[in-house]
């Protein structure tokens, strides 16, 4: 039987203001937790509309989560950070692991998220069915989805039938 958190108001669920943050924070609020969004100043207007976000830490860049002011505020609010892909996109694994704030899950596993070959290895070891990896544009033999390095949020992908359509 799962252990229940007795005093949910004692904890704050925090995440970065990115494509999945609204789902994370809405779910946390629905479950009775306080919520905190680490938000880029340029996007604050978007997130201020949502009444399930209790608090915000404004940053110029998401990498500031590793800075003392941000960590201090997260710890003062008794936050548990829910890491998302955006964190991996903005910071090295070493920097993420150095953050002295509780994370949901294991910070070390984010190395696998950041490294395409490690991620593929993890999926293979778990015996997950995955698409065939084509290592070179010269090896494209049929319609393929090409993912550029750093592709995120549905951007950075395209279709190619062969080397010629890849180069277009």
Residue ranges and their predicted role:
Residues 31-32, 98-100, 162-164:
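Glycine-rich, phosphate-binding/catalytic loops in enzymes
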Residues 14-16, 38, 151:
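Short hydrophobic segments within beta-strands
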Residues 33-42:
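Short internal beta-strands
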Residues 1-31:
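N-terminal phosphate-binding or glycine-rich loops at protein starts, especially the Walker A/P-loop
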Residues 143-168:
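Glycine-rich phosphate-binding loop of ATP-grasp-fold ATP-dependent ligases
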Residues 17-22, 42, 87-90:
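Gly/Ser/Thr-rich loops at beta-strand to alpha-helix junctions
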Residues 47-144, 151-152:
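Conserved N-proximal alpha/beta basic substrate-recognition cap immediately N-terminal to
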Residues 10-13, 34-35, 77-81:
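Short active-site oxyanion
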């Amino acid at each position: 039987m799962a252990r229940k958190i007795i005093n949910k108001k004692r904890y704050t669920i925090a995440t970065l203001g990115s494509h999945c943050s609204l789902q994370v924070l809405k779910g946390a609020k629905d479950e009775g937790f306080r919520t905190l969004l680490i938000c880029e100043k340029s996007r604050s207007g978007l997130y201020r509309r949502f009444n399930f976000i209790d608090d915000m830490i404004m940053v110029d860049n998401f990498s500031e989560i590793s800075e003392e002011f941000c960590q201090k505020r997260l710890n003062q609010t008794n936050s548990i950070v829910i890491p998302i892909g955006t964190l991996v996109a903005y910071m090295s694994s070493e920097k993420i692991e150095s953050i002295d704030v509780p994370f949901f899950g294991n910070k070390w596993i984010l190395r696998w998220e950041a490294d395409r070959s490690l991620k593929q290895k993890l999926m293979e070891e778990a015996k997950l069915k995955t698409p065939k990896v084509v290592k070179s544009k010269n090896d494209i033999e049929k319609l393929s989805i090409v993912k550029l390095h750093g592709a995120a949020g549905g951007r950075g992908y395209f279709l190619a039938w062969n080397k010629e359509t890849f180069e277009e």
